[in-house]
Amino acid sequence: MIRRIGVLTSGGDAPGMNAAIRGVVRAALSEGLEIYGIYDGYQGLYEDRMEQLDRYSVSDVINRGGTFLGSARFPQFRDEAVRQVCVENMQRRGLDALVVIGGDGSYMGAKRLTEMGFPCIGLPGTIDNDVAGTDYTIGYFTALETVLEAIDRLRDTSSSHQRISIVEVMGRHCGDLTLAAAIAGGCEFIVLPEVPFSPEDLVSEIKAGIEKGKKHAIVAITELVCDVDELAKYIEKETGRETRSTVLGHIQRGGSPVAYDRILASRMGAYSIELLQQGYGGRCVGIQNEKMVHHDIVDAIENMKRPFKGDWLETAKKLF
């Protein structure tokens, strides 16, 4: 029987993580369970930095970005001896289960703890929207609004100077954030990690737009596809149009979460407690067709793939 639960946030922060912690804490307390907050992710778990939380511990956090528990990348967690210390710390504290909020790297940590016999539930907290088994991740919609606002501002100045602007968006190997922001922001060109990219082809498309009378343009590109500064130089050289690159960077991770992220995080947090009380462990929570779902965390990491929104891209091409 589950009586005492730990909760931590891990990896890159995302708006809505605080709302998720709140959902876990309030739902656990409503069921008569004890809940412990673990500071700075798996590193804090290894260092035994945790404390008991009550309902007032999560007052006034639902509207705050970031995570009040803190987060840290802890590559040493790959070492089985380090994980064993973590398990021993939780056992000594009397914890029966752990809720982990983070991305796929955080899920991998939860998977390894589950394999060591300690039940974990994973909640998808990342702006990248790249976690399998869920339509959306906590923080994605807030980041989308942040990127869209930046694109709108770039369009103002790009149109004033008849300039080509390249905006680099986070997402790693997933183009969801870039694609959605590009459609919403009316970007003329989209470069995604899921689609083969050629600078020469992009320049040809830009030249075609110029020949049709296009005075300015915005290129939305997912990080890691290429060096955007070098791409800007190449486009300017080939087109004769002033071209500037803007890397949005970590500003995309900050800010007060939008309503949907707060609701999603709250629902997922509460659902994780339901699953633990039903005897589940080694699961990850998702939302599909607006319903809460759960999957085997090993299956989600190793076998499940996020479908590429090819139909969205085809729509975008028709609009630009």
Swiss-Prot record:
Upper lineage: Bacteria, Pseudomonadati, Pseudomonadota, Gammaproteobacteria, Enterobacterales
Catalytic activity annotation: beta-D-fructose 6-phosphate + ATP = beta-D-fructose 1,6-bisphosphate + ADP + H(+)
GO CC aspect terms: 6-phosphofructokinase complex
Oligomeric and partner information: Homotetramer.
Official protein name in the record: ATP-dependent 6-phosphofructokinase
Notes on how activity is controlled: Allosterically activated by ADP and other diphosphonucleosides, and allosterically inhibited by phosphoenolpyruvate.
Listed Gene3D superfamilies: 3.40.50.450, Phosphofructokinase domain (3.40.50.460)
Positions bound to ADP: 22-26, 55-60, 155, 186-188, 212, 214-216
Pathway: Carbohydrate degradation; glycolysis; D-glyceraldehyde 3-phosphate and glycerone phosphate from D-glucose: step 3/4
Biological role stated in the UniProt entry: Catalyzes the phosphorylation of D-fructose 6-phosphate to fructose 1,6-bisphosphate by ATP, the first committing step of glycolysis.
Localization: Cytoplasm
UniProt xrefs under InterPro entries: ATP_PFK, ATP_PFK_prok-type, PFKA_ATP_prok, Phosphofructokinase_CS, Phosphofructokinase_dom, PKF_sf
MF-aspect GO terms: 6-phosphofructokinase activity; AMP binding; ATP binding; fructose-6-phosphate binding; identical protein binding; metal ion binding; monosaccharide binding
Keywords: Allosteric enzyme, ATP-binding, Cytoplasm, Glycolysis, Kinase, Magnesium, Metal-binding, Nucleotide-binding, Transferase
Cofactor: Mg(2+)
Residues of the active site: 128 (proton acceptor)
Example GO biological process: canonical glycolysis
Gene name of this polypeptide: pfkA
